[in-house]
């Protein structure tokens, strides 16, 4: 994966995406307000009432960690994994300090430095972070009762392989949430490895259909939805995307 996600600019952008409040993220009365609070909405795709008492959760592609902390509200143990060393170092700093220093860029080199706190009700003591590859997860991480796999597939060289490995790290009855806007780019995934967005034998291949064909061997599809999200670049420029989302339950046999 390119070093794009190791730069200070991207780390700060993701800190704002994960931890800035509503007013800090979108300081306008107009705009896509439904796209705010993505990480909270993502974690809420997990039905906490169906988890075992001592549940383990994996936030695969955790970036700087917000979903991991949201999962800690109802999971006894949460592991966040990301390929970016910079993201994981930043997430660990937040874990240990409880503080999030970030810059709200306004224009050019102008911006406002602020320090936010972790949201109320999360349990940092339940959370840990690990640098790792979604395509080559270590056996030592064990199995999980809940997994969020968000906005990562279209940044992997071999997304099919990553999906196929999920069955090996989930307990029977485990819940899995997979979401992606499917922004396939050559710098991350060559055309031959993509899940969709092309024609094969004259027929359109859609990424969601490929995900279903891969996962249905070991999981049951429970629901699909669209999760919008908004990334602030600066005060007057934002990235708006819609992640196609599917919720799954691991088969018990």
Task: Please annotate each region the language model reported.
Residues 132-147:
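A short acidic, Gly/Pro-enriched loop at the edge of an enzyme's catalytic core
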Residues 32-54:
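Conserved alpha-helix/loop element of class I SAM-dependent methyltransferases that forms part
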Residues 54-63, 79:
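Conserved class I S-adenosyl-L-methionine
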Residues 84:
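Conserved SAM/SAH-binding beta-strand->alpha-helix loop
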Residues 174-181:
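Conserved beta-strand signature within the Rossmann-like core of class I S-adenosyl-L-methionine
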Residues 160-172:
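A short glycine-rich, Lys/Arg-flanked "PGG" loop and its adjoining helix->strand segment in the class I
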Residues 93-135:
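S-adenosyl-L-methionine
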Residues 107, 183, 188-224:
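Conserved Class I S-adenosyl-L-methionine
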């Amino acid at each position: 994966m390119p070093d794009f996600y190791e730069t200070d600019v991207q780390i700060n952008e993701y800190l704002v995406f994960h931890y800035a409040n509503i007013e800090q993220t979108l300081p306008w009365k107009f705009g896509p307000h439904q796209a705010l609070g993505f990480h909270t909405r993502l974690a809420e795709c997990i039905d906490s009432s169906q988890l075992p008492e001592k549940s383990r959760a994996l936030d695969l592609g955790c970036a700087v960690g917000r979903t991991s902390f949201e999962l800690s509200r109802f999971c006894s143990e949460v592991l966040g994994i990301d390929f970016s060393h910079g993201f994981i170092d930043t997430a660990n700093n937040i874990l240990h300090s409880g503080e999030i220093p970030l810059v709200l860029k306004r224009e050019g080199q102008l911006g406002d430095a602020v320090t936010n706190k972790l949201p109320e009700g999360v349990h940092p003591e339940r959370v840990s972070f690990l640098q790792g590859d979604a395509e080559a997860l270590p056996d030592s991480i064990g199995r999980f009762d809940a997994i969020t796999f968000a906005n990562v597939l279209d940044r992997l060289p071999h997304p099919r392989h990553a999906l196929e490995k999920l069955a090996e790290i989930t307990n029977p009855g485990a819940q899995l949430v997979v979401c992606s806007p499917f922004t396939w780019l050559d710098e991350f995934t060559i055309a031959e490895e993509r899940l969709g967005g092309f024609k094969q034998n004259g027929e359109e291949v859609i990424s969601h259909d490929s995900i279903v064909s891969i996962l249905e061997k070991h999981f049951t599809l429970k629901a699909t939805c669209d999760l919008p999200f908004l990334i602030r670049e600066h005060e007057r420029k934002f990235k708006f995307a819609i992640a196609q989302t599917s919720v799954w339950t691991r088969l018990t046999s």
